[in-house]
Amino acid sequence: SGAWKLPKLADYPAITPPYVTPEMKDNYTPYKRNPETGVRYWAIPGQEGYMHILGGLEKDSNTGAISTDPENHNLMCHLRAEKVAKIPVPDVEVQGCADDADLLIVGFGGTYGHLYSAMEEMKKAGKKVALAHFTYLNPLPKNTETVLKKYKKVVVAEQNLGQFAGYLRMKIDNFTPYQFNEVKG
C-alpha cells in the first residue's frame, strides 16, 4: 500500500454555482435548467419571488411542485441521467504493458495497491500484463469500451461479489470478463 496524498485545492477549478440572475426574475421557475449542463439555477433562499421547496417526492419539471404525473416522472429521470452523463471525466489510464498485454487487470477503489503489485509480480515472471484502475464509475470514462475490448483476456478483480464486473457487462455490449472476487480480504 502507499500513502494517500491530499490533493492541492488550488489545482481544482473554482466552484461557481449557476445563480439566478436579475434578468431571470420574470421567468424564473425552480426547475429551470442550464441547457449546456442540465444543472438547475440556484436561487438564494429568502429572496422574494424565488421560493423553492425541497423534498424527496418527484417534482414537476418546471414549477417544482410535487407531481405524480407519469410523463413528468419519465422526463425527470431522463433529465437527471443526462446531467450525470455530461460530467467531464478523465480517460481511464492503462499501466504496465499497455500496448501488447495478453491480460488486462481491472479494478476500482481501494484495490489499486494490491492490483498494481500483482501486475508488477506477473511482469517480473515474464507475463505481458496491464492494469486499468477506475476512479470514476458513473459516468464511466469515455474510453472505457475501447480499453476493455482491446485485450484478449480481461479479469475484473474485486473485494466483493462482482458488482463492478456486472456493471461493466451492463454498460458495454458483449463484454465478458473473467472475475476474481475475494470477499474475505
Predicted regions and their residues:
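Flexible, low-complexity linker and terminal segments
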Residues: 1-185
